[in-house]
């Protein structure tokens, strides 16, 4: 599996050129993309500026010598490469398995070319088998949990290995919704966004331009159909 992830991540780095501002994703597949950018800076003299999507990626990028800027200090991002937990045929996706969905969406928004790197197991006919993360403010989180429960969304607070509630980089909680199937990702996204106390959700609808899929037969690119 790691070999497939590496294949996708390294392939995606081919879209990065000198002088670009590059969004650096979070997660096990994006990790290989960031590593490859670091290698190209060191070995090929690639000149880029990175914008990170989590403290985890910031540490990785700093260790590789990738120059970084805050998303607040740039006008736009040329290309962002990130992973995804599930991707449907319309290229809507679920992200946030690593807990970085808010920062990932903030970086994706000013991005000109937004690319996901996945292994073929992430491509699904319908979203929802992977639990949908919802980032919520800590104050009132238990009330939101009950709201989700009453809607039949099978919520659970994400917890650490120690059993404490997981806290995101932005100091929020995550409630994972076990929905089974999501029939209308756009409508659900709108519904969740309208709930007071919800900061962001892990549905990335209509945001990605292309998905690089690594499988046993190599790499294929899936693009949004016009």
UniProtKB/Swiss-Prot annotation:
Its EC number is 5.3.1.6. It catalyses: aldehydo-D-ribose 5-phosphate = D-ribulose 5-phosphate. InterPro entries: NagB/RpiA_transferase-like, Ribose-5P_isomerase, Ribose5P_isomerase_typA_subgr, Ribose5P_isomerase_type_A. Disulfide bonds: none annotated. Substrate binds at residues 26-29, 82-85, 95-98, 122. The active site is at residue 104. GO terms for biological process: pentose-phosphate shunt, non-oxidative branch. The keyword Signal does not apply. Pfam families: Rib_5-P_isom_A. It is an enzyme of class 5 (isomerase). Keywords: Isomerase. Belongs to the ribose 5-phosphate isomerase family. NCBIfam families: PRK00702.1 (NF001924), rpiA (TIGR00021). Catalyzes the reversible conversion of ribose-5-phosphate to ribulose 5-phosphate. Homodimer. This is Ribose-5-phosphate isomerase A. It comes from Streptococcus thermophilus (strain ATCC BAA-250 / LMG 18311).
